């Protein structure tokens, strides 16, 4: 039994850690590349131009450009009530330096970097307890990164402003806010048309501090003030690079889970 444990500590685990490292180094999260030193760098081609589809109708409703960990451009078919036509294609750009940070990507990258760093800094594995603590910590980083990229939790709402090339393009309503996030290997764009309640005045400005109040249903809250979601549009498109990155995380997790199981078997003896 002691011989098997020594084989696990001196041969099996180092080999698995190297394989997990290779899987992590294969991740190019939306143009980011994790190097052997645990730092991320950007490749020469990082922009992803993706066609968005309405999740209800399946219609092509525009494009989104994802550059690194941010959305830098949106071209959407939006309903504008002031127009004689029910739908008008309006090119929009985001406020806040005309880019919307994809905080999921940023947060997931921090865990990927942490896991990659752990693969390079293997401690002296002189017991099953030491090895288990080391591998489980690495596995926790990998699982957390994958969870962040697939859950699609509420992140950040921001206002839009029109950048249309049309001569008589209608202005975007002030009560329109947008949210971009990842969910199950796709980029998802939510558009919310708000109606302010409890005497709240027209937005007129910054709405980026809004957060979804799931307990209140289709309500948004800002500094204790409520706004009702009068209309919600959901546009979505698959991200091929994201699917590949999730596969790489799954590969790393599978390798580490196998080792954790072997180490637990020794602890139970």
Q: Over which residues does each language-model region extend?
A:
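N-terminal intrinsically disordered, low-complexity regulatory tails that precede a folded domain
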Residues: 1-136
